[in-house]
């Protein structure tokens, strides 16, 4: 085996090492500090592991940080499209034979230095302080100061907001208190948390004094803590749900291919061949303009460059749902419909084995339970979900959840819970190379 002599180097370094690879080095050797030459590749909707690497760096004294690749997308402006947006050209767009395609489009900002959501994620991961603990009964709040030289009271001022179901119900400014660099400090923040609803306490870190590049009060980051009590149902959402007569009887009729469920204010149809809804009419409005689908496909991100060929080989992009058996059980207060189905594609074996259970109440409420088992021979799924094709007139969105920008299971540090309004088009993140985006 070829070996290398590292004796003249003061540190050990790797490009894009997995966390397990870093831990293995720290456990087995660790004689030199570990430097991440490049990490968190920021291509398109890509940098989803900032928090994991931050924790690794902070938890190990032998980790000396690293360099995110990279700052900006590199592309050339080529005029504007019909919609008024700038056209950006990259590798291959000028007729050259040898090029790297869009591999130069891997930054935290767009070519015009507009911020990517990845930079927002990066910013909040590296906020100056973090909540260690909060006792909502006593009000004791413990913070850790991540600054190397500044006492927290000299660098930031901290405001807070208490929200219930996304609406701010109280706010204020914390009194100054000392937290030494890389130390912990305590203060008291006593708040009155409502007995019900989804409640969150948000601490916002503001720059205390103007710096050469930053204004006073510039937001440096935030922490969010759930402080809900036992009743966590979103009361605001309950108010949105139209009031219906709950004791009205259901009419359930079925034939060889369809199940029709009708109540006083709604009419639903389920296709027995797919076990999914083809019609959802409620309070006089039809919501679906295309049958519902189980979905495992999405537009590949740039960081899917290697696995996307496996996805295509598995025909994930051509998958559809097929139901085999359906059982209908009608009770006093509703109907339960259970189907055995699968997600399949032509020329390949069954991808997913699926059990779908719909419980429909007399008032029209639908509870769904979808249990899925994947064939281990297939690669990891791009995603799994239910697609509902709504009338295009339903373009205004109001939701309680994480926002305002897109967020994912591994990319949500910059998002917080709130009540958000937007047009459907505004939820789109316009990556220069079209790809998965806009998860809210």
Task: Report residues per predicted region.
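Short aromatic-acidic-glycine turn motif
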Residues: 161-173, 210-211, 391-401
